[in-house]
Amino acid sequence: MKKKLYIINGPNLNLLGKREPEKYGKASLETVKSMCLEKCKGYSLDLHFFQSNVEGELISEIHKAIDDGCGVIINAGALTHTSIGIFGALSMFNGPKIEIHITNVYALSLIHI
């Protein structure tokens, strides 16, 4: 039985390739998914690739990984800095966890509404 790797993407990542391509690149999330699927073949991994703009849905996916995941790679987008719920769910997952970002989060300016 292959191990299942969860790749979880948060808010606005569905707009990759459309939203500020000079900052986030021109590749769509579907292109990223295809690249990940291809890479997983070489490691005998089943890939569970998920994206949502809803915090609770991201938490539910992490809960699924607790039951059958061998690892979690997460780009929680803007929720990275604010979600206690995502942090709590990830802390319950005992396998390896990797937090990724497309841009340098330390170089981002403060958000003003």
Language model: regions and residue ranges:
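Extreme N-terminal starter segment of soluble prokaryotic enzymes
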Residues: 2-5
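Short acidic active-site motifs
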Residues: 57-61, 82
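Conserved small/polar residues in nucleotide/adenosyl-binding loops
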Residues: 111-113
